[in-house]
Amino acid sequence: MEQVRLEIRRSAEGDVGRMMEIYAHARAFMAAHGNPNQWGPTNWPPEALIRRDIRQGNSYVCTHEGRVVGTFFFAWGKDIEPTYRRIADGAWLDDGPYGVVHRIAGDGSVKGVGAFCINWAYGQCGHLRIDTHGDNVVMQGLLNKLGFTRCGTIYVEEDDYPRLAYEKVGQGDGSSVPL
């Protein structure tokens, strides 16, 4: 079986159209798999947010043979995600600096894009947090498979909708600098 070669790079303005296509595919995939409310009703994420992420250097794409097949937000630092300051029904595993992944999506053309992107982000910092909707059983399964621990529930300020909070802590001091 041939190994699929995937690569990660920072997103550029020229990627926005393709990224929006990938998010449209992801919304349809989630709706078809019992998760119509996570991004569907609001056509999340908005293009303006994606452009802001790119300007701030926190937007990444996953490529296969030069074609963008996935995208995600990644940032790393101390208290990088204000929403994660309060967690209900549990506690975070570690209070040190951490990375966070948001808005991860693939176009469905290459198997393993989600795992590759999450593993890449984890490799940058060795301490990663991520959240997802209770209906997103596909993402929950992936996070469990990748060794994440469900730590509790967080509430996103924009919509106060509960999200399942996951964390993975391992070796590394976070000194790796993302692309």
List each model region and its residues.
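Conserved acyl-donor/pantetheine-binding loop and adjacent beta-alpha core of acyl/acetyltransferases
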Residues: 73-109
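A short beta-loop-alpha structural element at the N-terminal edge
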Residues: 6-21
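Conserved GNAT acetyl-CoA-binding A-motif
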Residues: 100, 124-135
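Conserved catalytic-core motifs of GNAT/GCN5-like acyltransferases
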Residues: 131, 149-163
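Conserved beta-strand-loop-alpha-helix junction that forms the acyl-donor binding cleft
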Residues: 109, 130-140, 158
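Conserved acetyl-CoA-binding loop-helix of GNAT-fold acetyltransferases
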Residues: 109-123, 141-145
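Conserved beta-hairpin
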Residues: 56-72
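Conserved GNAT-fold acetyl-CoA-binding loop/helix
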Residues: 28-48
